[in-house]
């Protein structure tokens, strides 16, 4: 069940997708005198766009006229592996800390894992390629929202890569209240399963 994360991406029309199935089920019932019960699990379709990752801009690097402007953030494949794995696209928005008008600037976004593949702006369907995005001009410390993160993000991330702790998660309720659903890991929790053999102590 394709769900469009980016502007212009088409999502599956569930009504259209179901029409051929309905007619086949009706035909089966007429021919065999019994009705079939079908259950589907379109989980991603329902929750992908219900979640967002909030990161912060940690550094801004300009590699010159023939290079790129990079935004380095305090997140990456430890929370959203999809871009690095298969060139998946996620909507990204820089949120200025100050209420001011800023220009639009072309950026590549790099994660914090010290991996050449930890990039949140690959070419579509090509994790080996790079594709810049026009975003609001960023400053160090600005928050960044990475949308479409409600499915196949935390659940398939490179957890604890480079000993980064698992991020906290919250739910934003209908009334605007925020509720913690998972605490951020401590370093002790990251290391708790490590054992040092006796002969090395």
Predicted feature residues:
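Active-site-proximal beta-alpha loop/turn segments in soluble metabolic enzymes
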Residues: 1-13, 42-46
